[in-house]
From Swiss-Prot:
It comes from the Bacteria. Negative regulator of scrB expression. SUPFAM superfamilies: lambda repressor-like DNA-binding domains, Periplasmic binding protein-like I. Pfam families: LacI, Peripla_BP_3. GO terms for molecular function: DNA-binding transcription factor activity; transcription cis-regulatory region binding. It comes from Pediococcus pentosaceus. Coiled coil: none annotated. InterPro entries: HTH_LacI, LacI/GalR-like_sensor, Lambda_DNA-bd_dom_sf, Peripla_BP_I. Keywords: DNA-binding, Repressor, Transcription, Transcription regulation. This is Sucrose operon repressor.
C-alpha cells in the first residue's frame, strides 16, 4: 500500500501540517524536526502527492544543483556557468550546498523531490547516498559514481596529475611531493594522485604523498603545510587544487624559499579567479565552460526523453596554464 502524508507524520511523531511545511520548505522548523520528517519519508519511500503533476507531463522548469562547497572558487564558477546556461533555456535553479555532509545531501535531495524539480545535477562527493538510486528522476553527476544509470561528466584527472608532475620534473624538480585531499573511493583527486604516482614511477623517482583533510580551515591547513615543508626539502610540489597551491607559495615565502629556483609549484583547477588574480601560478586547467555545457545538455536530453541513450561516462581533456611557479 502506498504510504500517505499521515503515515509520515505518524512515524515522525509530528502533525501532518508539519510534514507539509517540511516538504514545501515553508516557515521556520528546527533541523531536528526536519530530520525526523525526512527520515520517515526515506523509511517509507514516500513521494509527495504533488509529484503527480510532473508525472502528467507538466514540467516545473526547476533544476536542482547539489555541490559540496560553493565557497570554493571552482564550484562557485561551475555553478555560475550552469545557472547561466539553464536560465537562457528558461529553467530556474535550486542550489544546494551539501558541505560534504551526507545527511545534509540526503535532506536536500528529499527537498528537491518534494519541490518537483525536473532534474538534478549532482556534484557533491559524499558516498553511499542510496536515494539517488531510488528515484527515477533525470540526474547527471559531476566527477563521481552515483549509480549505473546516471551518467558522469568529469575532466581527465589522471592525465592532469601526470601533466602537472611532468611539468615539475621538466622544470628541474627531482624530489616531488603531492598535497592532496583524503583518499576515498570515487574522489576525483584519486585520479590526479594516480597520474602523479605513475609519472614518477616511470621516471624511477619516489612519490611523496601528503593528505590534507578537506575540513581544515585555511589557517590550519597552512600550519600543516608549513610543518611538512620544514621537515622535507622538496624541490617540487603538486597540489590537487589551486587554493592549496597558494598556501604553499605563502609558506615558501615564510621559509625564504625562492620560486621557482628552489621550489617549483603546480596547482589544479585553473578557475577565472586564479587566471585573473594569481596568474603567477602554473596550474592544470579544467575546462569549466565545456563541463557546464555538457552537464546541462545531457540533463535536458534525459528530461526530454527518459529513455534516451547516454554514455556512462564523459571525460574532457585538461590543459596546462603556464605561470612562473614551474
Amino acid at each position: 500500500m502506498k504510504p500517505k502524508l499521515n503515515d509520515v507524520a505518524k512515524l515522525a511523531g509530528v502533525s501532518a501540517t508539519t510534514v507539509s511545511r517540511v516538504i514545501n520548505n515553508h516557515g521556520y522548523l528546527s533541523s531536528q524536526t526536519k530530520e525526523k520528517v525526512f527520515a520517515a519519508m526515506r523509511e517509507l519511500h514516500y513521494q509527495p502527492n504533488n509529484m503527480a503533476r510532473s508525472l502528467q507531463g507538466k514540467n516545473t522548469r526547476l533544476i536542482g544543483v547539489i555541490f559540496s562547497d560553493i565557497s570554493n572558487p571552482f564550484f562557485g564558477e561551475l555553478v555560475s556557468r550552469i545557472e547561466k546556461i539553464l536560465f537562457a533555456k528558461n529553467y530556474k535553479v535550486i542550489l544546494c550546498n551539501s558541505a560534504d555532509d551526507p545527511q545534509k545531501e540526503r535532506d536536500y535531495l528529499q527537498m528537491l523531490m518534494a519541490n518537483q524539480v525536473d532534474g538534478i545535477i549532482a556534484g557533491a562527493h559524499n558516498l553511499g547516498i542510496e536515494e539517488y538510486q531510488q528515484y527515477g528522476l533525470p540526474i547527471i553527476s559531476f566527477d563521481r559514481y552515483l549509480s549505473d544509470n546516471i551518467p558522469i561528466v568529469s575532466s581527465d584527472n589522471y592525465q592532469g596529475g601526470w601533466l602537472a608532475t611532468q611539468t615539475l620534473h621538466q622544470a628541474g624538480a627531482t624530489n616531488v611531493a603531492i598535497f592532496t585531499g583524503k583518499s576515498h573511493a570515487g574522489s576525483p583527486t584519486n585520479g590526479r594522485r594516480e597520474g602523479y604516482e605513475a609519472y614518477l614511477t616511470a621516471q624511477q623517482l619516489t612519490p611523496h604523498v601528503h593528505e590534507l583533510p578537506f575540513e581544515l580551515t585555511p589557517a590550519l591547513k597552512m600550519m600543516e603545510i608549513k610543518t611538512i615543508m620544514t621537515q622535507h626539502q622538496y624541490d617540487g610540489i603538486f597540489c590537487s587544487d589551486d587554493l592549496a597551491a597558494l598556501l604553499v607559495l605563502n609558506v615558501a615565502q615564510q621559509l625564504s624559499l625562492t620560486v621557482p629556483e628552489q621550489l617549483r609549484v603546480v596547482g589544479y583547477d585553473g578557475t577565472a579567479l586564479i587566471r585573473d588574480y594569481h596568474s603567477e601560478l602554473t596550474t592544470v586547467e579544467q575546462p569549466l565552460a565545456d563541463i557546464s555545457t555538457l552537464l546541462v545538455s545531457l540533463l535536458l536530453q534525459r528530461i526530454e526523453d527518459a529513455n534516451c541513450t547516454l554514455e556512462s561516462k564523459y571525460t574532457l581533456p585538461v590543459k596546462l596554464i603556464k605561470g612562473f611557479t614551474a
